[in-house]
Amino acid sequence: MDIKNFANLWINSWNSHNLEDILSHYADDIEITTPMIKTFTSGEDTLKGKEAVREYWGRALEKVPDLHFELYDVTYGINSVALYYQSIMNKKAIEVMFFNDEGKVKRMHAFYTD
């Protein structure tokens, strides 16, 4: 997998605000853990399954119509990538993503600055 290409496609998907394009990078059994979940819901900090993630990200895109990410750097590991980027609410973010055998993200952990 070309990690830099993945990173650019991922950023462009988010900046397009096209939910289906965003979700195309993720496995059906995706598990995401991020403190932003509590910002946009009253639930847990982890969501499981593409449908739960679709609902959450759909609401988030509605609440942040001017969402625009700027990629700063990309690092990689074994079947994984970490993206460092400018996120929403003037925060910098690092997302660590782990890929399944099909090259889809199966697990993601997000970290943000204050």
Q: Residue spans of the language-model regions?
A:
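A beta-strand edge to alpha-helix "cap/lid" segment located at domain peripheries
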Residues: 58-114
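Alpha-helical interaction segments
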Residues: 1-5, 15-16, 46-48, 75, ...
